[in-house]
Amino acid sequence: MPRRAARAALPLPDLVVLVLQGGGALGAFQAGVYEALIDLGIELDWVAGISIGAVNAAIIAGNERDQAVGKMREFWEGVSSALPSLPVVDNDWAREWTHMAAAGQVAAFGVPGFFIPRFPPPAFAERQTPEAVSFYDTAPLVATLDRLVNWDRVNNGKVRLSVGAVAVETGNFRYFDTQCDTIDARHILASGALPPGLPPVEIDGNWYWDGGLVSNTPLEHVVETANKDMLVFQVDLFPARGDRPHDMEEAWSREKDIRYSSRTRRISDGLMRRRKEHRLIDRMLEKLPAEYADLPEVKAVRKMVDCKALNLVQLIHQPPAWQTGARDFEFSRSTMEVNWALGRDAVEAAMKDGHLLADSIAEGRSDSFAVQSNALRPKAEPDVS
């Protein structure tokens, strides 16, 4: 049952979570989503991220609620400062050309406050060192995070933070979580250390790479470790649906969308299906004769069943026609502003039909929603037959 209400007349359950996936420069979309949620009076209890999502999550958890948007704006204006806004031409071909040129500049010169090209290059570095296995140095991001994030607040504040990374030597996925770990800039860098561009990060004697190599969304960690009714806003940076590509640029873009969104969709659909299956099992257990209630097998099944309500809202970045497969490493100011505005628009579109979500929360149901055709719609029911 809801425990509080946002200014958007949305009842909020025990746990409100923002889930942020990886996607480089597309993280500005996440910032727009967060700003819109704050404007609606929606308070977060937990933020979980991978890669650029971990960066945004750390800024959220590491600042007062009324300061976090400003700090996020400072971060995104900083990383886009080398490529200021150019005159916007109302022509997709011209915008695509400037978009690709901006991405090329990032590849050649790096991103201010984020990463710079390594010199000397990795071929001249000592073998089996971070310098030998990456083209860029992320030391600037450490300084940026230490300036924008209050780590004491991250580890002792009200908003729980979780970030995901993968161990290089074992391939095992790991979440660093303020509920059991002390998090600092190293953990954020580890979550976004995408090889071979960015270097692995050593934590407790182990090297870690970008968590997106295994899973680009921390939704599974959130759902499986929580034991409360929850509302989850999942920000997806790569759409599952798209048009048939016309050329190589569009093929590159579509391939990237499918590669990342398919794993995210499989996880989210699987979790919702499991939650609905648990509801059915719980109803079946209630119908068992009383003499079976104390059987070890029945107790074990009852313990496994999770019937807490889960409402999932997927806010999906829908790229303009001129954004190509380079959009996750195109950090120009004009594109950053476009992505930020798209994030705000996604939340506003969802709240136009907020009564659908409000009804589901108030009734204690588990449902999944997504913004489609500029409106919030329930996703198709997972088949539990």
Regions found by a protein language model. Name each.
Residues 11, 155-157, 305-308:
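Extracellular/periplasmic catalytic domains that process cell-envelope and extracellular macromolecules
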Residues 12-17, 24-133, 139, 145, ...:
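Patatin-like phospholipase
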Residues 43-46, 206, 310:
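Short active-site oxyanion
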Residues 48, 164, 231-235, 311-315:
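Hydrophobic/aromatic beta-strand patches that form the interior of the parallel beta-sheet core
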Residues 122-228, 234, 241-254, 328:
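Active-site gating loop/helix substructures
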